[in-house]
């Protein structure tokens, strides 16, 4: 059986960042490391503009990914969140 993948695109507000932003980032990295250790987060990519990230989850539903994203320390700074299921092209 093929693993299911879900893509999450997170964009945060970068104007008026809180004073403890570096602390929030540190906690965010800890959460991401735990997700990778639990093996349901396959990869995280930072956006070139540094205003968000792209996360690739595996073996979770869209709903589960949405719930996980709400637990991120950066979530309160969220400007937008897109969660998209991915379908592998098995012909290639």
What are these regions (language model features)?
Residues 1-92:
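Conserved, structured core segments of small domains
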């Amino acid at each position: 059986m093929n693993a299911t993948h879900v893509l999450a695109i997170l964009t945060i507000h970068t104007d008026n960042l809180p004073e403890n932003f570096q602390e929030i980032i540190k906690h965010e990295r800890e959460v991401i490391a735990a997700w990778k250790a639990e093996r349901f987060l396959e990869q995280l990519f930072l956006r070139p503009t540094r205003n968000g990230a792209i996360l690739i989850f595996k073996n979770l539903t869209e709903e589960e990914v949405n719930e996980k994203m709400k637990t991120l320390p950066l979530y309160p700074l969220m400007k937008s969140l897109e969660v998209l299921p991915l379908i592998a092209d098995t012909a290639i």
